Amino acid sequence: MTLVGPHRDDLVIEQEGRVLRDVGSTGQLRTAAVSLKLAELATLREASGREPVLLLDDVFAELDRERQERLSVRLGAPGVRQVFLTAPRRDELPEGLALDVFEVRDGALRPAAVPV
């Protein structure tokens, strides 16, 4: 067990002077977490000069439609080249998602028959 290091630190995010963890909705907390992940992506890209792979598991869960659509646009933006995200059901993906969509059926990965 390690007793010191960045993994032992707490990060406090505030919104309008209040701690988001204490007052934020589930969607706001999820949005903050995704925002940190996108900032990490930009930092890694800048530091390495290469495009990192972005892995997001069930990222649209607990986000309202507006937040889903804004994130969808951000993920399809120029410069974001390698994004892998999962969703348990196809209807949980926002309409117009500008990414290639694949599905796993019978243990095989294949392009989705119907675009989102």
Predicted feature residues:
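Conserved NTPase motor "head" modules and their coupling/switch loops across ABC/AAA+ ATPases, GTPases
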Residues: 1-55, 62-66, 70-82, 91-100, ...
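Conserved H-loop
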Residues: 87-89
